[in-house]
Amino acid sequence: MAFLKKSLFLVLFLGMVSLSICEEEKRENEDEELQEDDEQSEMKRGLWSTIKNVGKEAAIAAGKAALGAL
């Protein structure tokens, strides 16, 4: 009976350790995915600000040209 208890505790302990390792790896993968998403959103923000600046400069140039034509 004592042998069965020890074996059962050993199996449960090893199962818990295995589960803990799997959860840790899962968290690491999720963190990597979040980092990639953050990098992509930073790139999009950078592109958006560039497009916005070009649009502003084009509007200013068009306004100056319109005033110059008057």
Curated annotation (Swiss-Prot):
This is Dermaseptin-H3. Residues 1-22 form the signal peptide. One of its GO terms (cellular component) is extracellular region. Its main location: secreted. Belongs to the frog skin active peptide (FSAP) family. Dermaseptin subfamily. It is found in: Secreted. Residues 30-40 have a biased composition (Acidic residues). Residues 25-44 are annotated as: Disordered. The keyword Secreted applies.
